[in-house]
């Protein structure tokens, strides 16, 4: 009986874990379960469910559609929407002439500093003229500033058959200018600085005379001042409350 009890008893198990087998350095990769292939191509980012509505809106904007209504595409003739808009140059109706360029020297503690000043006259040859002044360290920058300043100083002057309506005189500081009307075909009899103003203003026949200082800025400003003092026959008739025929 004792032998049977000993044979039927289970062997005692040790509490120590079994030793692990030495690793060979290879990793075991488990293959995913076989199933249907994804709808997107390999290497393509999987679309997120929350972005489905955004993708639809982007697709509608790209095709210029919004629901059932169709929007017209952007006007291709408009230069603002052209691809070569950066290369397109802005063409202004005003012509410009450089009257004077001067180099300015400023003496400072470290030495001398040089800069440039430009004086420019612009006009559209249709009764609008103006002048501007600009300063910069380089000549092109000074000219650009002068042109920009001239656009802010535009004035309108009267033109009667290509000449001034009547004789006029104006003075600015030490410069004085006389402008007279001339018959058709006479041309512009004026100095270079006076010619720059009257030609860009749109006059074709004028006789002028300059007195006193020949400074470029003073002469140009005196010419513009003289042109602003001009009055047409219609303007004078309105002031006197008469007809134009009575004045003539």
UniProtKB/Swiss-Prot annotation:
Source superkingdom: Bacteria
Biased composition (Basic and acidic residues): 57-87
Boundaries of every S5 DRBM domain copy: 94-157
One GO biological process term: translation
GO MF entry, a single one: structural constituent of ribosome
CC annotations in GO: small ribosomal subunit
HAMAP family according to UniProt: Ribosomal_uS5_B
Listed name of the protein: Small ribosomal subunit protein uS5
């Amino acid at each position: 009986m004792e032998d049977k009890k000993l044979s039927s008893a289970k062997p005692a198990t040790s509490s120590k874990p079994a030793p692990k087998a030495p690793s060979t350095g290879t990793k075991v990769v488990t293959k995913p379960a076989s199933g249907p292939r994804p709808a997107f191509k390999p290497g393509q980012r999987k679309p997120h469910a929350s972005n489905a509505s955004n993708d639809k809106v982007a697709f509608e904007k790209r095709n210029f559609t919004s629901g059932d209504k169709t929007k017209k595409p952007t006007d291709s003739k408009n230069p603002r929407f052209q691809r070569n808009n950066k290369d397109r140059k802005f063409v202004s109706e005003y012509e410009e002439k450089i009257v004077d360029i001067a180099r300015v020297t400023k003496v400072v503690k470290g030495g001398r500093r040089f800069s440039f000043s430009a004086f420019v006259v612009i006009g559209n040859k249709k009764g609008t003229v103006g002048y501007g002044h600009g300063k910069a360290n380089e000549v092109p920058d000074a000219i650009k500033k002068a042109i920009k300043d001239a656009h802010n100083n535009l004035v309108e002057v009267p033109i009667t058959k290509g000449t001034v309506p009547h004789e006029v005189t104006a003075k600015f500081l030490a410069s004085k200018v006389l402008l007279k009307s001339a018959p058709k075909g006479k041309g512009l009899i004026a100095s270079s600085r006076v010619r720059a103003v009257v030609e860009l203003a749109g006059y074709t026949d004028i006789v002028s005379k300059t007195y006193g200082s020949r400074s470029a800025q003073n002469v140009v400003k005196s010419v513009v001042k003289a042109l602003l003092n001009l009055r047409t026959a219609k303007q004078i008739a309105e002031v006197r409350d008469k007809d134009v025929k009575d004045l003539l």
